[in-house]
Amino acid sequence: MTLIELCDNCKLPKSSTLRCRMNLEQARFNMVESQIRTWEVLDQTVLDLLLTIRREEFVPEKYRDLAFADLEIPLGHAEVMLAPKMEARMIQELDVRKTDKILEVGTGSGYVTALLAKLGGQVISVERVPEFSHAAMRRLAGHGLQNVQLHSGNAAEGWPTQAPYDVILLTGSVPLLSESFQQQLAIGGRLLAVIGESPVMTAYLVTRASANAFSSVGLFETSIPPLRDVKQPERFVF
């Protein structure tokens, strides 16, 4: 009996690898054109990056067929990969620059980490689930990204040991934004967080203008899973 090796991505025989790659690239192109452009992501640098970084390689194997679908993908431990359009919009709004020092709260699969690393100078990414950090480290190394520090820990109040940051991204929602995050921003730094409680949440961009001056702009309404271990606001009981 002759054993036929299957491609990890499409499950076709490896002899069909070229066809598999063409199918993947078409699916990636369709994701960008149909989902992401239509969600007001028009920055060409971001769009080109989404066509370059292979999202399917960051998706758990059993969900790989959904790598380009407009939905959240379960990672386990009550965490998800955000929908592609949400990831892209967050990246665009932060206007990441090559000199930026970036804090990512919630590494997850490592895909957004990879996008940030391609655009920025240095990325510090903190994840509460150690196995996610270990898996992300392997994936990022496979993409040749060496400007990332991965930490296992609780960054629900930020990561002050390496502050200040030019960019801070929270990949899960918070009911209220802790002031500690704002204090970890450099002057001119930008922070993006989805604030509120389901079903009503808003993505905000916070900019630090000076030592004591901050501006906040509501960007769009959405709903994403919460950041874990975040202090909940006090509630009145009548």
Feature annotation, model-predicted:
Residues Q232-F238:
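Positively charged
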Residues N9-C10, T161, T222-S223:
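Compositionally biased, intrinsically disordered/low-complexity regions enriched for serine, proline
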Residues S16-L103, Y111, L119, F132-H134, ...:
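Class I SAM-dependent transferase core
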Residues D95-S215:
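Conserved nucleotide-cofactor-binding alpha/beta core module
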Residues C7-C10, C20:
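Cysteine-centered motifs
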